[in-house]
Every structure is written in C-alpha cells, then in structure tokens.
C-alpha cells in the first residue's frame, strides 16, 4: 500500500536489447509487474534520440518486441551502443503523467539479421 497521493512502482527488465535493422524490430524484455500501481511507457534512447517507444503498459503486462520509430534506422549502424530505458509513469485513475521518470542503462546490439 502507498499513502494517499503516493505511488508504488516495481520493474522487471533485461539490460540487453537487440535491434534487427532488416525488419526494424527491437527485442527486449520490459514488464510492469502486477503489484505496480502506475501505468508506464518505456522508451529506448541512444545518443539523446528516442528510437523506440511503447504504448501504455498496464500493471501485469510486458513487452518483448517493439517497432523502431520512423526513420530511427537511419541513425543506427551495426554495432553495440550504450543506451537507456526512459520510463514514463502515469496515474492509473486520472492518466496524469508523473513528475518522476526513471532512466536505466542498457546495452543495445544493432544487427542486420538474415531474412
């Protein structure tokens, strides 16, 4: 339980992210556990550019693949990048964006996989 006006957040994630430039698909693990009381959006940021953004992730849900944002593939070449998850929190009742965000360092491997 949290105090009135407070929040409780719990995260499950992997710090390894991979991107397939042939399909513009991002493979990751990010979950908003059922005990959380906040909705979330996860972004992946490389070199201060948001390259991926999920939709709203409600407690008890997770994402394993996302599409690159339009033209993000033009900013990337094959290699390993230091990136970050940028987590945005939203109140489940009124949908207001929370003031606090979370940044988590991740390693992003960019490849062109065979079809």
Annotate the PLM regions.
Residues 56, 67, 107-109:
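Generic structural detector for well-ordered beta-strands
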Residues 46-47, 66:
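Short acidic/polar micro-motifs centered on Gly/Asp/Asn
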Residues 62-72:
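Exposed aromatic-hydrophobic patches
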Residues 84-92:
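Beta-strand-rich extracellular modules
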Residues 49-61:
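Solvent-exposed serine/threonine-rich low-complexity stretches and specific carbohydrate-binding patches
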Residues 1-45, 93-115:
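Primarily secretory-pathway and cell-envelope proteins
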Residues 72-82:
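Short glycine/proline/serine/threonine-rich loop/turn segments at secondary-structure transition edges
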